[in-house]
Amino acid sequence: MTQLTKKQKSFQGKVDSNKLYPLADALGLVKECATAKFDESIDVAVQLGIDAKKSDQVVRGAVVLPNGTGKTKRVAVFAQGAKAEEAKAAGADIVGMDDLAAMIKAGDMPFDIVIAAPDAMRVVGTLGQILGPRGLMPNPKVGTVTPDVATAVKNAKAGQVQFRVDKAGIVHSTIGRRSFDTDKLQGNLAALVDALTKAKPATSKGVYLKKVAVSSTMGVGIRVDLQSIAA
C-alpha cells in the first residue's frame, strides 16, 4: 500500500477526488494546496475525445495566454539578413545560422524556444536528433517555422504555450503561477480550451472535451466542471 506523504495527508478533507469543482473554486483550492517555498506552476490536463493512434487526430498547436505564464522565455532564432535583424529587434535572445547550429551541436543551448525562418531549415534540419527529443525542433504547425520571425518572437515572449496531445489523448500545459490572481488563471485556461476547441480534428466523433483537471507543481489534481469554463 502506498504511503501518503505528510503534505498529501494535509490535502485530505480539502479535496474530494470524485467531485467536479467550478473552475474558480478548483483554482482557489490548487493555490491553497500549493505550499512549496517557490512560486509553483499551475498546470492543466485536458482529456480529449480523440484516438491519438490515428495520425489525422493528433491535436497540436500554440496559443498566446492573455496573462502570460509567469516565466520569461529565452528565444533562439535561425535567420539571416533582414530576418535576423527583425528577430533581434523583436527581442530574440540569440540569432544566428551556422554559428548557432555549432553552439547547439556543442551542447550549448541557453534557450527555451527555437524559431526558424523557412530558408533556415536547411541548417535546422541537421539538428533534428538534438532538438527533437527536447521538444525544441521548429515546426510550422505551432508557428515556429515562419517568415514572420518578429511576430513569432513577440508571441513567445508574451506567454505563448505549445500543446500536443499525448498517447493517452491528454494535453498538458501550464496556465500560470501560484502568485497569479484566480481570474488571470481562469482567463489563461479559457484561452487554452478555446485553442483546443478550434484544433478539433474533423474526424473526431462524440464528446471532444471530456475531462479537465488543474494542479500545482507539488500539489494534487482537482477535477473541473467543464460547464464553468468560459472560452
From Swiss-Prot:
It comes from Albidiferax ferrireducens (strain ATCC BAA-621 / DSM 15236 / T118) (Rhodoferax ferrireducens). Pfam families: Ribosomal_L1. GO terms for molecular function: rRNA binding; structural constituent of ribosome; tRNA binding. The keyword RNA-binding applies. This is Large ribosomal subunit protein uL1. Keywords: Repressor, Ribonucleoprotein, Ribosomal protein, RNA-binding, rRNA-binding, Translation regulation, tRNA-binding. GO terms for biological process: regulation of translation; translation. Binds directly to 23S rRNA. The L1 stalk is quite mobile in the ribosome, and is involved in E site tRNA release. GO terms for cellular component: cytosolic large ribosomal subunit. CDD domains: Ribosomal_L1. PROSITE patterns: RIBOSOMAL_L1 (PS01199). Part of the 50S ribosomal subunit.
